[in-house]
Amino acid sequence: MVAKNIKYNEEARKKIQKGVKTLAEAVKVTLGPKGRHVVIDKSFGSPQVTKDGVTVAKEVELADKHENMGAQMVKEVASKTADKAGDGTTTATVLAEAIYTEGLRNVTAGANPMDLKRGIDKAVKVVVDQIKKISKPVQHHKEIAQVATISANNDAEIGNLIAEAMEKVGKNGSITVEEAKGFETVLDVVEGMNFNRGYLSSYFATNPETQECVLEDALVLIYDKKISGIKDFLPVLQQVAESGRPLLIIAEDIEGEALATLVVNRIRGGFRVCAVKAPGFGDRRKAMLEDIAILTGGQLISEELGMKLENASLAMLGKAKKVIVSKEDTTIVEGMGEKEALDARCESIKKQIEDSTSDYDKEKLQERLAKLSGGVAVIRVGAATEIEMKEKKDRVDDAQHATIAAVEEGILPGGGTALIRCIPTLEAFLPMLTNEDERIGARIVLKALSAPLKQIAANAGKEGAIIFQQVMSRSANEGYDALRDAYTDMIEAGILDPAKVTRSALESAASVAGLLLTTEALIAEIPEEKPAAAPAMPGAGMDY
């Protein structure tokens, strides 16, 4: 077992403080509209330029193992806030440093760390309740655009694109961010159910120019096994041909005699048909086929459910207003399924998302929900250079998450103003605490609430304490607009923060800072000293 280096009490806390401060100094310069960029060296390719707090935090690794523990704990604050709300990572880091620094001063002066932590936790609960009270729901397209614009570092183009995407795909829709090939940042919206499986033969294409197969008022056959022979398949094909409507076939695979028959039918000008493979794999494939069945009002023909392809009838087939199939993907527009069944399916998927512990599973479930309930929007980010594109893509990601958070829990006056407006409520709560050290813990939170505003002011080249006093003396929604160096009504000016982001930042910061304050010992491995390299042989590497 490797020997360990152990630090105790004051020495341990000083090491943690140095690690916390080092990480926080790198992260907090990015806060606010006049925050600076951080350039991160990469082992390959060009350096990364970012203003995203969690991206900066993730890159920090300190040489001193004890100091690194403090840095890693604050890194956890940024990561947890990003996981919960998708934004607010820099605010969370600033709050964590403020709570820990002030808390450490009081512990050194003799306060009981456990009582301090209890006081911090009680104060955070009071502030969170107040945040919920003062938040207001997002009601307009304009407010969504404003939240996204602020989170994208005051880029109105990104803000408007995200608001447009949210409007088109709805609350449950999926917005994905990709890199564009050109300079322009554009929005593509795919309405209806879309999956990445194209037609099995180009003979199915109905439009030779676009190489797409477009089926209007189509029937949809959904089968979970391979179709190779024609015998079992023929009865349902004959019924469809008699109905005169086009047919989309979705199955695990269609091959051999079955595929050949369908292709020959198309070449001879028979009824319009298109065959595609089922999306996904394993259990996910079955779930997606069930989704398609509910969306189109059909049934999944599955032998597991006692259904055979040879017994399939028109009543079992789904219906869609339009189906568009290209070489790469299939889109089902306006499926004719019952709204009640569709809503129940969406609720079931939402429950699975809540219960899932895997990020990958959550992402796939979210995709399914989006496809069922509204559609998928793709924002393609363009820029002149790869470095600029990556930086812009980070900002689009932040803005997207902030917007989703705003829709979930409402909005607050931004620029750190909302936390300032919670100070009077917390001051009124202090006399209710009978334990002196708990009261000190609550005062630590009280002081920390002004830290984000002061940092925004400092990054704008102003004196934080003066700006704080000015904001404190003003009415509810009035705050400091660092971009324009003016005091204004933050809601009217469109400087908004999602309530979920502010709440998550404070909760994560207080949680980790409280743990650090109650730490009395640090244990780390003693780094091994590498033996010095052997001296070079005389004359080595010389030509004679």
UniProtKB/Swiss-Prot annotation:
Describe the reaction catalysed, as an equation.
ATP + H2O + a folded polypeptide = ADP + phosphate + an unfolded polypeptide
| InterPro entries listed in its UniProt record | Chaperonin_Cpn60_CS (IPR018370), Cpn60/GroEL (IPR001844), Cpn60/GroEL/TCP-1 (IPR002423), GroEL-like_apical_dom_sf (IPR027409), GROEL-like_equatorial_sf (IPR027413), TCP-1-like_intermed_sf (IPR027410)
Instruction: Answer yes or no on keyword Thylakoid.
Output: no
Question: One of this protein's GO BP terms?
Answer: protein refolding
Q: What induces it?
A: By stress.
Q: Which domain of life is it from?
A: Bacteria
- Where is it mainly found? cytoplasm
Entry keyword annotation includes Zinc: no
Record SUPFAM superfamilies: GroEL apical domain-like, GroEL equatorial domain-like, GroEL-intermediate domain like
- PROSITE patterns given in the database record: CHAPERONINS_CPN60 (PS00296)
Where it sits in the cell: the answer is:
Cytoplasm
- Please give the Gene Ontology molecular function terms for this protein: ATP binding; ATP-dependent protein folding chaperone; isomerase activity; unfolded protein binding
Q: What is its EC number?
A: 5.6.1.7
Q: Which UniProt keywords apply?
A: ATP-binding, Chaperone, Cytoplasm, Isomerase, Nucleotide-binding, Stress response
Q: Which GO terms describe its cellular component?
A: cytoplasm
Q: What Pfam family is a match for this entry?
A: Cpn60_TCP1
Residues that bind ATP? 30-33, 51, 87-91, 415, 481-483, 497
Q: What does this protein do?
A: Together with its co-chaperonin GroES, plays an essential role in assisting protein folding. The GroEL-GroES system forms a nano-cage that allows encapsulation of the non-native substrate proteins and provides a physical environment optimized to promote and accelerate protein folding.
Q: Which NCBIfam families match?
A: GroEL, PRK00013.1, PRK12849.1, PRK12850.1, PRK12851.1
Q: Which family does it belong to?
A: Belongs to the chaperonin (HSP60) family.
HAMAP family, sorted = CH60 (MF_00600)
Q: How does it assemble?
A: Forms a cylinder of 14 subunits composed of two heptameric rings stacked back-to-back. Interacts with the co-chaperonin GroES.
The protein's name:
Chaperonin GroEL
Q: What species was this sequence derived from?
A: Chlamydia muridarum (strain MoPn / Nigg)
> Per UniProt, what is the name of the gene that codes for the protein in this document?
groEL
